[in-house]
């Protein structure tokens, strides 16, 4: 699997409390959600969290980044953490051997797409005690000024995250 850029592999089950953290960025970064704060770049952080998800799940995560890399500010850190949660959900629940993460920086902002080829799911059927989609993805992105679209069906799921410039 991809090794996190920081060289640290989180132990399974070491996720911080999702309810903790600032209203703008969500959880306080911990061993499993740091992104690549050492390099401080969007692309570095995305590659790091993809490696973390691989280490936690043994599912291959295939990140692709396009455009000019950017510094990792608060809203982009929230985007990276939402992408991590989307990739973790796909790796955990889709039944797929691999998940694709595509990130593109454009003049209008940053788009990240997390795709799997699993059986899909209905967001309405997610139990209220499950916080991944509702809080770790949707609420985190909205608090940081971005938006989320989830398209899911029998041929797979795509989580689209957008953070405007």
Residues covered by each model-derived region:
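ATP phosphate-binding glycine-rich loop and adjacent ATP-lid/helix-beta elements
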Residues: 125-154
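Short beta-strand-loop-beta element adjacent to the nucleotide/active-site pocket used for signaling
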Residues: 105-112
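Conserved ATP-binding N-box helix of the HATPase_c
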Residues: 75-99
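Glycine-rich nucleotide-binding loop
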Residues: 109, 120, 153-160
